[in-house]
Amino acid sequence: WRNPGPSLRDKGWDDYMQLGPLAAMDAVTETTGEERMNVIGYCIGGTLLGSTLAWLKKKRRNPVASATYLTTLLDFSDPGGIGVFINDHSIRGIERLLERKGYLDGRAMAFTFNLLRENDLFWSFWTNNYLKGQKPAAFDLLYWNTDGTNLPAKMHSFYLREMYLNNRLVQPDALTLAGESINLSGIDVP
């Protein structure tokens, strides 16, 4: 694992699938000798896991005994509060930034999440720290939220357009990953 910078700008969803979950599953099998495993995906990692399981199903590979998803979107038809930021105009603006920089800075993502809970994660700190001069109280969620992960340009653009804007992940065979069209409804992993 590493935090991507400009040199990884052309890494896409396919690359993340092949170099992430698929490589990890191969490493588990090679290290332990076990051919089936239990897996977990969190947030965008869960979306990647769902994509991977659909791809594995298409390839008739079955290394996963069970899958657990935590705060994961697979159907993006109602993404919650972040949906106000998802439209073609906004995405084109983000893509212009991605073209220049090569990646989305994790701090930009953290700021977006802060705005989703602006009273708790933004304005209270602005008021108390800046206006009132109070020392901020320790808050573990804020530390976690500032430990952002950069996202490569190609992967992030794909994620925004294909998942959020067009909701193609839940459309059978609407996405092709590593040469295979995928269908989430074909996944039979508990």
Summary of predicted features, one role per range:
Residues 1, 71-72, 180:
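Fold-independent oxyanion-binding glycine-rich loops
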Residues 1-31, 81:
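Cap/lid segment of the alpha/beta-hydrolase catalytic domain
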Residues 2-4, 23, 45, 54, ...:
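Short, glycine-/Ser/Thr-/acidic-enriched flexible segments
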Residues 8-9, 13, 36-40, 148, ...:
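Conserved aromatic-histidine-acidic binding/catalytic patches
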Residues 30, 34, 48-156, 167:
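Alpha/beta-hydrolase-fold enzymes
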Residues 34-37, 189:
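Short coil/turn segments at beta-strand junctions that form active-site/ligand-binding loops
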Residues 40-45, 49:
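Gly/Ala-rich beta-loop-alpha elbow adjacent to hydrolase catalytic centers
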Residues 138-190:
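C-terminal subdomain of alpha/beta-hydrolase-fold enzymes, centered on the catalytic histidine
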